[in-house]
Amino acid sequence: MNKLRQSFRRKKDVYVPEASRPHQWQTDEEGVRTGKCSFPVKYLGHVEVDESRGMHICEDAVKRLKAERKFFKGFFGKTGKKAVKAVLWVSADGLRVVDEKTKDLIVDQTIEKVSFCAPDRNFDRAFSYICRDGTTRRWICHCFMAVKDTGERLSHAVGCAFAACLERKQKREKECGVTATFDASRTTFTREGSFRVTTATEQAEREEIMKQMQDAKKAETDKIVVGSSVAPGNTAPSPSSPTSPTSDATTSLEMNNPHAIPRRHAPIEQLARQGSFRGFPALSQKMSPFKRQLSLRINELPSTMQRKTDFPIKNAVPEVEGEAESISSLCSQITNAFSTPEDPFSSAPMTKPVTVVAPQSPTFQANGTDSAFHVLAKPAHTALAPVAMPVRETNPWAHAPDAANKEIAATCSGTEWGQSSGAASPGLFQAGHRRTPSEADRWLEEVSKSVRAQQPQASAAPLQPVLQPPPPTAISQPASPFQGNAFLTSQPVPVGVVPALQPAFVPAQSYPVANGMPYPAPNVPVVGITPSQMVANVFGTAGHPQAAHPHQSPSLVRQQTFPHYEASSATTSPFFKPPAQHLNGSAAFNGVDDGRLASADRHTEVPTGTCPVDPFEAQWAALENKSKQRTNPSPTNPFSSDLQKTFEIEL
């Protein structure tokens, strides 16, 4: 009975170890190289692992997957998770797992990404491999159970795929001919060849090109031999012939590097320029970036060159060379260089500096008579002045006069420059400009000549007597019209204006200021003055068009004193105080309020018989008073005080 029962049972195959079946392994190696090696398997699944290699890592993954199958099978019964029956295809390109029923591609793994494969020591039919996931960049272990074969045979087949892939890669590297050589003298690496992988189609095209190049080279050699025997001058290849310059270049390239792939070039006929072609003549100029058939140089772009050259000059005041520039233009340049339109120091308060005392000057006499400088009230004969525009903090010397008004600008710019450039010292001007006395003498002579040349024209002007003091009602009128040559302020306050005394003087044209108000030129008297008087006249009256005639002829000078009314104080000063016209928006000088520089008896008028005041000192006081009203330093800017004695020439 027992034998009968055994006869009906399925007989098991005799177990033959894998080591005793080398003939099957050899067929697996051939199948892997041809891409026909496949094994029926059950795909257990994949899990993430911590390491990229190790048999214990693969065994742990198999245990985890089999445990999950048992849990689902026990919990859901027969509807649990089952292993998928599939076919494992092993080739030199990669591993592919295809569903046996649906023929769906479950796994497609390139062989280069597989880091480790091994059979399982606990399960004879188990096999697993570890790979790098391309998306998550994690190590994934895929596990299989062989149906007919052992896991050792599957692992051997994957090993054969590794070897085939390595051989193919070495063959590609040998074909591309990439070699790296090190030059000790230049300490550089030189790479020859290309790492680009050629496909089968490219390889066929390359072989065809190589064959054509060899044929062209052979034809060229034959033609050269024939041409040299017939006519030595007819050896130049025609454009349509296969021996074109492109062919020559590829031939020489092939001789130097046989593995190089020649570039594709257009035929010469297509590259020939047509007769109707018109170039771009504007692009062939000197500054054009397309003047060469080379790469564009960034440093030679017009915008780059302009950006490199358009930087501010460090020394804004150029050196004087000869007599090309006048003192007026130099004054204008220095004023432009050192006067800023706005105050950069406006954040924190600062203590006020001390008062600057006006320097002393020698006694000045006009025609041998002491010329008293007195404060005169507003004249009765007034002329309508232009509408006063709001005073902007701008530089009145921003627009220098032209060459035709050099003499006028020379007389106008002396005092204004001395007041507006407080940050500069006289030594700086003398150090930056190598001044010589002879040039100053020549300048004085030019001014004297121009003044004397215009004297006959000015002598016809009628002389007007000293104007009478105005009635008291004229003082209390803030909106009354001012004198025509007065430099008006933007504040409607009564200010003292010098009477329009008109001796023989040079009528100079007025020029506009940056804020839109006409700035009249000073009036220079010409009654037999000396060069020193001319200097005093220029630098004493250039900045004050209101003080029309500080140095007048003796017949016109009256020892009179009129009260002076200001908007800030009700006191009178024996010195002339011009209107509160200032450039920097300040109305006090170095923090001292108005009237502090006046004499002790400031609340009393100076009697008519007092001693005559030194005119030059009075002018300096007037300068100081004007700077007091227009150059008060900002509480945060120590450089805003721009009163400065320019220079003094004694002859």
UniProtKB/Swiss-Prot annotation:
Residue ranges occupied by any PID domain in the UniProt entry: 33-193
GO MF term set: alpha-catenin binding; beta-catenin binding; cadherin binding
Modified residues (Phosphoserine): 194, 244, 276, 295, 425, 438, 634
Keyword Cell membrane: yes
Biased composition (Basic and acidic residues): 436-449
Polar residues bias locations: 630-644
Subcellular location: Cell membrane; Endosome membrane
InterPro entries for this protein: Numb/numb-like (IPR016698), Numb_domain (IPR010449), PH-like_dom_sf (IPR011993), PTB/PI_dom (IPR006020)
GO biological process terms on file: adherens junction organization; axonogenesis; lateral ventricle development; negative regulation of protein localization to plasma membrane; neuroblast division in subventricular zone; positive regulation of cell migration; positive regulation of neurogenesis; regulation of postsynaptic neurotransmitter receptor internalization
Main localization, broad class: membrane
Annotated function: Regulates clathrin-mediated receptor endocytosis. Plays a role in the process of neurogenesis. Required throughout embryonic neurogenesis to maintain neural progenitor cells, also called radial glial cells (RGCs), by allowing their daughter cells to choose progenitor over neuronal cell fate. Not required for the proliferation of neural progenitor cells before the onset of neurogenesis. Also involved postnatally in the subventricular zone (SVZ) neurogenesis by regulating SVZ neuroblasts survival and ependymal wall integrity. May also mediate local repair of brain ventricular wall damage.
Coiled-coil regions listed: none
Gene3D superfamilies: Pleckstrin-homology domain (PH domain)/Phosphotyrosine-binding domain (PTB)
Region (Disordered) location: 228-255, 419-483, 623-651
Keyword entries, A-Z: Cell membrane, Developmental protein, Endosome, Membrane, Neurogenesis, Phosphoprotein, Ubl conjugation
Its membrane topology: Peripheral membrane protein
Modification after translation, per record: Phosphorylated on Ser-276 and Ser-295 by CaMK1. Isoform 1 and isoform 2 are ubiquitinated by LNX leading to their subsequent proteasomal degradation. Ubiquitinated; mediated by SIAH1 and leading to its subsequent proteasomal degradation.
Phosphothreonine: residues bearing it: 102, 243, 436
Protein name listed in UniProt: Protein numb homolog
SUBUNIT field: Interacts with SIAH1. Interacts with LNX. Interacts with CDH1. Interacts with TFAP2A and TFAP2B. Interacts with RALBP1 in a complex also containing EPN1 and TFAP2A during interphase and mitosis. Interacts with AAK1. May interact with DUOXA1.
CDD domains: PTB_Numb
Biased composition, class Low complexity, residue ranges: 235-252, 453-466
Keyword Phosphoprotein listed: yes
